[in-house]
Amino acid sequence: VPVELAANQVQRGATARSQSSRIGSVAARAADAARHEDDVGVLYVGERGVDEVPTAGSFHGADAVADTDEVGSVELIEHARERLALVGRHPWVQHNGNLHVRSLPRFAIAATSSGIQRCGRNLYCATMGTSVDIDRDALRTKYREERDKRLRTDGNEQYVEVTGIFERYIDDPHVESTEREPLFDEVTVAFIGGGFAGLVTGAKLHEAGIDDVRIIEKGGDFGGTWYWNRYPGAQCDTAAFVYLPLLEETGHMPSEKYTHAPEILDHSRRIGRHFDLYDNAVFSTEVTSLTWDDDARRWIIRTNRGDQMRARFVAMGTGPLHRPKLPGISGIETYRGHSFHTSRWDYDYTGGDPSGAPLDGLADKRVGIIGTGATAVQCIPHLARTAEELYVFQRTPSSIDVRNNHDIDPDWFTTLQPGWQAEWLMNFTTLQTGGFAAEDLVKDGWTDISQRIRDKVLSNPGQEFTRETFIKAYEDSDDEKMTEIRSRVDALVADASTAEALKPWYRQLCKRPCFHDEYLDAYNEPGTHLIDTNGRGIERIDAAGVWANGKHYELDCLIYASGFEVGTELSRRSGFETTGRDGEQLSDHWAGGMQSLHGIHVHGFPNLFMVTLSQAANLISNVPHNYLESGATIAAIIDHALQVDEAEGSEVTVEVTADAEQEWVERLEAGAVGRMTNSPDCTPGYYNNEGQSTGRRGVLNSMGYPEGPVAYFQYIDRWRSSGDFEGLEFQP
């Protein structure tokens, strides 16, 4: 492709300026040489005396190789693209703040021998392998200042619940609910929730020969959060090979490394079809109560459709990412323009579709979007390209690292051996949680975080590995990573003041890390305006628009990218109360914090199974992996109960003993350590309960297996495979 390049200086030190100038000159000369080669897309530039210039046989990360002394002769690598496709990814290297690159329509820039890294749309950035001097004391001070200006005493109460006059924000825009007769039948297993938790558990039950399963879903189809989230640009930020469950079982090959929402929704439907889960499912149906009938030894499930179903076993996987929340901004109810939440995107108004078609309905519209979290990062580039004027109201910027997405090569995919997905899952989890593996199969931003920490630890051979040395390694590597991320903002955003406002001043894991190659570019669009509130948030909303920083912005459309209810009570998020033996409600049982065995079983609630992250693996970066293990465990227990039925000649109930529940909680609590997201270096967000202390209750609600996810997955596999199901009672 044609190569355009602009290089400039961003570091102030004389050495850095000299280095930047030199590299900029080299890159420009190499790019100029590449313009004469029709097949060249990405250049490699090495420096004599620093690193040996690689040959075509040793480096497959570029389409061309050049040497600083011989940039006029560009050697093409014959099968570079094929090799890249073969390994399924680009090389991963660090972005270098010494090289300042302005975003131009189509270009690539030079890279050193460490490789190349895509840092924007049609943009590749270089690494020099040089360290950046960081004043860590000044950085801590800056982090605390940014945190303090955002702290609020109301925590989660700053958000508005979508009830009453706001209930329209949760209407289903995808289907029209049709009337049906209420159901009064009985099933062996009912699962509440049709997302990946329900689909995976249903699949595991099907594999165990248990087919009398009903999934109850409030959406119009399977998919869970991916049924609701169809905003433009919606995409998973965990690699599809480990995020999409049951790929081998369904025979599906992801089309790209980070799949977009339409494909994820299609895969949810594929799982439903493959395992016959549609046969007995009910959609557009919300559970209103779940009550244990001790005489009948059945769960009674009541819904908003008048149903009163009965189920011997019930599993719950309602998840936190389906119930939207609105910002509690004064006057929000007075706005008279068009408005919607990103999880209920109104394509009838904006034009376009979930596949990425232009939002041509906004061509003459002044659009405001509130929020700059993971959802906003993905949809803002689409809004910026089409809206006449786009106003992005920001309280806290997200950290935006490289995504480096690419298509998957079908020929390479066919080389994967049976059992590959289980191997990739454990490889990803091992590396992402600080373990060691011979190879990084996924190679993404998540595993890079842990790789950096390991590199820091290993850089001091002989040093005793303790929690303190780990934290020190984490802090040092994070300081360097966040410095790179902030430098990347300078490299991609043309306006200096906008770039400064987009820089995240906190640790990378304080908030959900974002990976995107077009978001920062969006602020170079002439009609896109960042309205940074310096942590204060919007002042108020009126009938015509938004007040921020003492200025009024008239808007035709206001979009809320304000996220979901994550830290609220389970009964509030799920929309129903669960009542167990002797009339005890689950919310009362958990009044002092979650109590369970494996995050699945709760004493006093027989034949009930929970699918959660807490008090189990608690793997946040790849949630479906948790579901695979929980689903397999639930299926094994129900299958065992049915076998006991046959052996005993009567039905049994399954329940964790009070002692086993208490022992499990005590074991986890004894090993719980302070979460890094609760440090003074972290700005408020849903990762840390909006910066509010939660005490012991919060620890119980969020703690996981002390030895980590990998150890938990190994433990739970041994536990369910033993056939003893220690801690459970199967009572006739």
Residue ranges and their predicted role:
Residues A6-Q9, A30, A34-E37, V42-V45, ...:
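Intrinsic low-complexity, disordered N-terminal segments enriched in polar/charged/small residues
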Residues A14-S20, V42-L43, D51-V53, A64, ...:
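Hydrophobic helix segments
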Residues G129-V189, G194, H206-E333, G337-S339, ...:
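N-terminal FAD-binding dinucleotide-binding subdomain shared by FAD-dependent oxidases/monooxygenases
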Residues R12, R17, R22-G24, R29, ...:
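Intrinsically disordered, low-complexity segments enriched in small polar residues
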Residues G352-P354:
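Acidic/histidine-rich helix-loop elements
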Residues G202, H206-E207, I380, A384:
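Gly/Ala-rich phosphate-binding loop of Rossmann-like dinucleotide-binding domains
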Residues G198-L199, A376:
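N-terminal Rossmann-fold NAD(P) dinucleotide-binding loop
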Residues Q11-R12, F59, D63-L123:
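Polybasic, low-complexity intrinsically disordered segments
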